Amino acid sequence: MAGNFWQSSHYLQWILDKQDLLKERQKDLKFLSEEEYWKLQIFFTNVIQALGEHLKLRQQVIATATVYFKRFYARYSLKSIDPVLMAPTCVFLASKVEEFGVVSNTRLIAATTSVLKTRFSYAFPKEFPYRMNHILECEFYLLELMDCCLIVYHPYRPLLQYVQDMGQEDVLLPLAWRIVNDTYRTDLCLLYPPFMIALACLHVACVVQQKDARQWFAELSVDMEKILEIIRVILKLYEQWKNFDERKEMATILSKMPKPKPPPNSEGEQGPNGSQNSSYSQS
């Protein structure tokens, strides 16, 4: 783990400007509304979470995989690489970077196939069409895009420090931790430093648990306007999420999503440089 966030590639290269992020997204917003794009974000975060849990990965590994996924599509259209392939690729890479240990090829493909069939069959009625050669090639493109900047800082550690400083660990930590997990369904991890996200989640937890922490927050040397911006995004997430029926909506949204060329049959697959350019698009 790099010692200082302010000197890290996370801060120097991967805290993005919101307007630049929206500009990069315009290609996809020709096919999807902003609300549909947001629902895709929630959905694929759920896929990564379910896959990570199936593989018994730590939450930090799952969070890192989610950040990798978001970084890729912050720079490229959904059409460039199928998100159904990118999701397990991000899990595969994150498990190595976070020193959890390499998930074996067979186990990764079996887990992805099982999770999509049992948890997300309403969205993916067909078998998972990719094999390990696709994952490895996708990993190459992901590494290239991130320029091998693989260390990701998360809000979990600062959150622990803050609740301990408050002396409210038992009351606030479980709820604030869950709120941090939920923020990965938004763009917040691309836009704000993790310590600010931690403070915003803690603030929301204090309000929900009716803990008066105004004095504690007032003593912080932090831009509270930015904390309030993050809180507004969190509240908007919960407001929209409660009206989102994944089972009814996702098949239609996925059908509208811009896609690369169709995947090949499992026999005689070829990568993006072969005659069957399955999961990648150069456009």
Swiss-Prot record:
GO terms for molecular function: cyclin-dependent protein serine/threonine kinase regulator activity; identical protein binding. InterPro entries: Cyclin-like_dom, Cyclin-like_sf, Cyclin/Ssn8, Cyclin_C_2, Cyclin_N. The modification Phosphoserine is found at residue 275. Component of the Mediator complex, a coactivator involved in regulated gene transcription of nearly all RNA polymerase II-dependent genes. Mediator functions as a bridge to convey information from gene-specific regulatory proteins to the basal RNA polymerase II transcription machinery. Mediator is recruited to promoters by direct interactions with regulatory proteins and serves as a scaffold for the assembly of a functional preinitiation complex with RNA polymerase II and the general transcription factors. Transmembrane segments: none annotated. Component of the Mediator complex, which is composed of MED1, MED4, MED6, MED7, MED8, MED9, MED10, MED11, MED12, MED13, MED13L, MED14, MED15, MED16, MED17, MED18, MED19, MED20, MED21, MED22, MED23, MED24, MED25, MED26, MED27, MED29, MED30, MED31, CCNC, CDK8 and CDC2L6/CDK11. The MED12, MED13, CCNC and CDK8 subunits form a distinct module termed the CDK8 module. Mediator containing the CDK8 module is less active than Mediator lacking this module in supporting transcriptional activation. Coiled coil: none annotated. GO terms for cellular component: CKM complex; cyclin-dependent protein kinase holoenzyme complex; mediator complex; nucleoplasm. Keywords: Activator, Cyclin, Nucleus, Phosphoprotein, Repressor, Transcription, Transcription regulation. It comes from Mus musculus. It is found in: Nucleus. Disulfide bonds: none annotated. The keyword Repressor applies. One of its GO terms (biological process) is positive regulation of transcription by RNA polymerase II. This is Cyclin-C.
